[in-house]
Swiss-Prot record:
InterPro entries: A-amylase/branching_C (IPR006048), Branching_enzy (IPR037439), GlgB (IPR006407), GlgB_N (IPR054169), GlgB_N_E_set_prok (IPR044143), Glyco_hydro_13_cat_dom (IPR006047), Glyco_hydro_13_N (IPR004193), Glyco_hydro_b (IPR013780)
Organism: Actinobacillus pleuropneumoniae serotype 7 (strain AP76)
Name of the coding gene: glgB
Catalysed conversion reaction: Transfers a segment of a (1->4)-alpha-D-glucan chain to a primary hydroxy group in a similar glucan chain
Gene Ontology cellular component terms for the protein in this record: cytosol
Pathway annotation from the record: Glycan biosynthesis; glycogen biosynthesis
Gene Ontology molecular function, alphabetical: 1,4-alpha-glucan branching enzyme activity; cation binding; hydrolase activity, hydrolyzing O-glycosyl compounds
Keyword ATP-binding carried by entry: no
Active-site residues (renumbered): 408 (nucleophile), 461 (proton donor)
SMART domains in the record: Aamy
Protein name: 1,4-alpha-glucan branching enzyme GlgB
EC numbers: 2.4.1.18
Top-tier EC class: transferase
Length: 777
């Protein structure tokens, strides 16, 4: 084709393509019919020549460059409804063969578009984002993104010199999705979406559904395959059940341990090799990871994510993370992920004003802006936003084997007036303060995970008294499996901060939690939030001198492990780190090496033994959420600050927990018990092994048939100072009890016989009575 006559369509598309605002490139570029012939149009701004090749490499036509902007047109001698062709493109320094993206049809099915628009696609991450695939025998990447209000969206990356003119995408008006298949793009390629918004502004955005991201401060998404599904271990998921022991070790991967020589992070492999054996040895059943979805600012600890589907690149690749989780499972340890779906940061490469409109967030800052955190609130009422967030729960459980999600800042999600003054928030449609859309999102997501999650659990960090957090949605609940008990944590830590002499006046701070214990399924949390921002460490919250602080801490942990509810402890607290947590440094492991570890080693040993005892005795966990599993034995001894309660298992076995929160030894302290048997002190926080003063009961404790505290039997104890002791009861064997009962019955019969009067005795008594009566007359 030597000459070319421009049409109005040509002139229009030359302007659209060269000025980079073409919304429908597939209607013009690629193979099209033109009367009795076919034409192929190619737009390559930097090219000097373009030839059309057949599948076997034969030149079918040489394209004519009809505009300096880079538009080439090739005419074929016959009509083709479809054609497997390639491009041979000449540049100033070389000539290379390329596939034409505009010859490939969309792989988005009508059903996908419909489900995505409706917000009911269970797994939109299988469609949206960047997916390695083969189309018509050609390998490449299928890109798709939701941006309904954009004028134009292009894929840009290191494969097209980040030039938004080269690969504009196809728009699906019915769903607002843009897509394109780019041949020969490979795993590891960097990319973003260049978006022209309705105001003519260019926005360079990371992929919301990216499966990998660049290491900060760079912000490009990285092409990688959708992770394969993980086969669920039913036994491990059973370990999430309410009648199982759950002891959670909360970890920030960036500061648990670091390389001493340069203060740099361990990678996922190094973490797996060190963290998992440690957690296993310490007796924890679960690891909870602070957020590991990609985030730009280290100081956010991961709580301001920009890539919910992308594991942070700080510690390695997504496959490395999957290996870490697999190794935890092999060790019998479940993994929980801190899940942040309440807000997102304002970083320009993220979700904020994604297509120029308030797409993921609310437009009105009274609904869409978090004043406390300078973040934006998701618009849960928008179908596509709901779908984006809800399916993320399945992504982590199915593709990484995550066993549970801990949902961050639930209170900020469900209340429209959270941390706002009057006039700073908008009521819901009924005039109330509840965020009905957020509640609907949580209910539907929890219901979906119950159905699809194969036993994965969802835990709420919810700090108010909102009713029904762990109740079923069918009962007007929200459907979480567990809820953090922030009230118990705050009350008990306040109590422990008091000098023992004043604790008697605040006795109820340790007992009040039982008033609402069975309203929800609670986790007792001593989390990262309690050891930052000037709150000091958990050890630092304890009252007294150094010895008393450690004794108080051991006693407090004992009370916590004995109390109903699952356990959570933030890293460093297991060995009583003295300073606040610093996300930018390793924990103070050196404390365990100084002078043999001293008091810190004592606390470490105590926590290890608490965990092991907790798992050994079903009484300490089986009936956490059943009133039949707990009974106060001593609840009102405020003058001596002593507490005692009994934990019971389904089979009736029990463990008694006794705490003394004064530095005074309580000798000969009698506690009523419900059954006779052998009582044994199985744990004592004051033992020398834990660096205590070694006061205790030294083995078996005699049970006596002396009534006390309304019980038929009792035991007499020596309760160490600032301590918690655990006492296991082994009831007398049934045969022994029956034998004793038989002996008692025989004795009673013998006694009755001994006291029963004979006939002779009756006769004598009668005569004496008659004589006395006669004399009286």
């Amino acid at each position: 084709m030597k000459t070319y006559t421009y049409s109005k369509q040509d002139l229009s598309f030359i302007e659209q393509l060269s000025q980079a605002y073409c919304k429908d490139p597939f209607s013009y570029l690629g193979l099209h019919q033109a009367g009795d012939v076919s034409v192929i149009r190619v737009f390559l701004p930097e090219a000097t020549t373009v030839k059309i090749l057949s599948a076997d490499g034969q030149i079918l036509s040489e394209a004519l460059k009809i505009d300096d902007s880079g538009l080439f047109v090739a005419q074929l001698s016959q009509q083709y409804s479809s054609l497997n062709y390639r491009l041979r493109v000449g540049y100033s320094l070389a000539e290379i063969d390329l596939e034409d993206p505009y010859r490939f049809t969309s792989s988005l099915l009508p059903m996908d578009n419909w489900l995505l628009a409706e917000g009911t696609h269970l797994r939109p991450y299988e469609i949206l984002g960047a997916h390695l695939k083969t189309q018509e025998g050609v390998s490449g990447v299928h890109f798709s993104v939701w941006a309904p209000n954009a004028r134009r969206v292009s894929v840009v990356g290191d494969f097209n010199y980040w030039d938004g003119r080269v690969n504009p995408m196809r728009f699906h008006a019915e769903s607002g999705i843009w897509d394109i298949f780019l041949p020969n793009v490979e795993k590891g390629a960097l990319y973003k979406f260049e978006i022209l918004d309705s105001n003519g502004n260019i926005r360079l955005k990371s992929d919301p559904y990216a499966f990998a991201s660049q290491f900060r401060p760079d912000t490009a998404s990285v092409v990688t395959g959708l992770p394969e599904k993980i086969e669920v271990d039913a036994k491990l998921r059973h370990a999430n059940d309410p009648d199982q022991p759950i002891s959670i070790y909360e970890v920030h991967l960036g500061s648990w341990r670091r390389h001493l020589e340069n203060n740099y992070w361990l990678n996922y492999e190094e973490i797996a090799n060190e963290l998992i054996p440690y957690v296993k040895d310490m007796g924890f059943t679960h690891i909870e990871l602070l957020p590991i979805t990609e985030y730009p600012f280290d100081g956010s600890w991961g709580y301001q994510p920009t890539g919910l589907y992308s594991p942070t690149s700080r510690f390695g690749s997504p496959d490395d993370l999957r290996t870490l989780i697999r190794k935890a499972h092999e060790a019998g340890i479940n993994v929980i992920l801190d899940w942040v779906v309440g807000h997102f940061p304002t970083d320009s490469h993220g979700l904020t004003e994604f297509d120029g409109s308030h797409l993921y967030e609310h437009q009105d800052p009274r609904e869409g802006y978090h004043q406390d955190w300078n973040t934006l609130i998701f618009n849960y009422g928008r179908h596509e936003v709901f779908n984006y967030l809800s399916s993320n729960a399945l992504y982590w459980t199915e593709r990484f084997g995550i066993d549970g999600l801990r949902v961050d800042a639930v209170s900020s999600m469900i209340y429209r007036d959270y941390s706002r003054k009057d006039g700073e928030w908008i009521p819901n449609q009924y005039g109330g303060r509840e965020n009905l859309e957020a509640l609907d999102f949580l209910r539907r997501t929890n219901r979906m995970l119950k159905k699809e999650g194969h036993g994965a659990v969802v835990i709420a960090e919810e700090s108010t008294s909102f009713a029904g957090i762990t109740h079923s949605p069918t009962e007007n609940g929200v459907g979480f499996d567990y809820k953090w008990n922030m009230g118990w944590m705050n009350d008990t830590l306040r109590y422990m901060s008091l000098d023992p002499i004043y604790r008697q006046y605040h006795h109820d701070w340790m007992t009040f939690g039982m008033m609402y214990q069975y309203s929800e399924k609670f986790v007792l949390p001593l989390s990262h939030d309690e050891v930052v921002h000037g709150k000091c460490s958990i050890l630092g919250k304890m009252s007294g001198d150094c010895w008393q602080k450690f004794a108080n801490l051991r006693a407090y942990y004992g009370y916590m492990w004995g109390y109903p509810g699952k356990k959570l402890l933030f890293m460093g607290n297991e060995f009583a780190q003295g300073r606040e947590w610093n996300y930018n440094e390793s924990l103070d492991w050196f404390l365990l090496g100084e002078q043999g570890g001293g008091w810190h080693k004592g606390v470490l040993n105590w926590v290890r033994d608490l965990n092991r005892t907790y798992q050994k005795y079903p009484a300490l966990y089986q009936l956490d959420y059943d009133p039949a599993g707990f009974e106060w034995l001593v609840v009102d001894d405020w003058q001596q600050s002593v507490f005692a309660f009994e934990r019971k298992a389904k089979n009736g076995e029990s463990v008694i927990v006794v705490s003394n929160f004064t530095p005074v030894v309580r000798h000969n302290y009698r506690i009523g018990v419900r059954q006779d048997g052998t009582y044994t002190e199985i744990l004592n926080s004051d033992a020398a092994y834990y660096e205590g003063s070694n006061v205790g009961n030294y083995g078996e404790i005699e049970c006596e048939a002396i009534e006390s505290h309304g019980k038929p039997f009792s035991i007499e104890l020596s309760i160490p100072p600032l301590s918690t002791i655990f006492i296991a009861c082994q009831p007398k064997p049934k045969e022994a009890v029956e034998a004793e009962q038989d002996i008692v019955k025989m004795a009673e019969v013998a006694m009755q016989k001994a006291l029963k009067p004979t006939k002779k005795t009756v006769s004598v008594k009668a005569k004496a009575h008659k004589k006395a009566h006669k004399n009286k007359k």
